[in-house]
Amino acid sequence: MNHAAGLSGMDEMMTIEDTYDWDKMTRALAEQAPWWEPGTASGYHALTQGYLIGEVVKRITGVSLGRFFNEEIASPLQADFYIGVPDSEFSRIGDLVPPPNSDIIGGDTAIDSIAAKTFKSPSISALDSRTDAWRRAEIPAANGHGNARSVAKIHTLLANDGYINGQQIISAETCRSIMQPRIQGMDLVFGNPMAFGLGFGLIPAEKNTRNLCFWGGWGGSRAIID
């Protein structure tokens, strides 16, 4: 969960249509040799992170990550957020407007570099998010759909030791564990120094005196939890 598995992309060329096929993506990842020794460095797993974690959830619980998230987190919190949007909600989704420069690679851009390969397979565009196929699919690292209120409500769990509205959704121990640094150093994809806990970015340990974690996504979304 700290982008250190060495599987930030795949040697096999995957298309945008492939990202909608859960079994194909997880099978390709299972067959993929890590691009670096796992646990030795982070490298932003832009799309693959969701499949790696989601498959673990599926094998343990028997349901997809989208369904698990809905049943265990979104529904109890009445949070208007989906991983895999029902057709009935499509009319409520605003089209994503790509930034003028969508190149987020800050590291080595040589064609055979880890950074370049990560965004080559699978290669996606912000405009892909406007399609019905994208919205229906479960691509947990990239296609969660919600509004600002739902994002704030869900992340409030971490700020309150997993407790909200009279419910203990996540254990306090798990919340504290998320804030613990797991890996820190030069990220092999971003090309910037990064620190990661469990699933979230962290302020570098020597400066993180307030237990802050954060993450963001397309469309300018960002959550900072204190």
Where are the regions that the model predicts?
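Short, surface-exposed loop or secondary-structure junction motifs
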Residues: M1-K207
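Short, hydrophobic/aromatic-rich segments at coil-to-beta transitions
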Residues: K207-F214
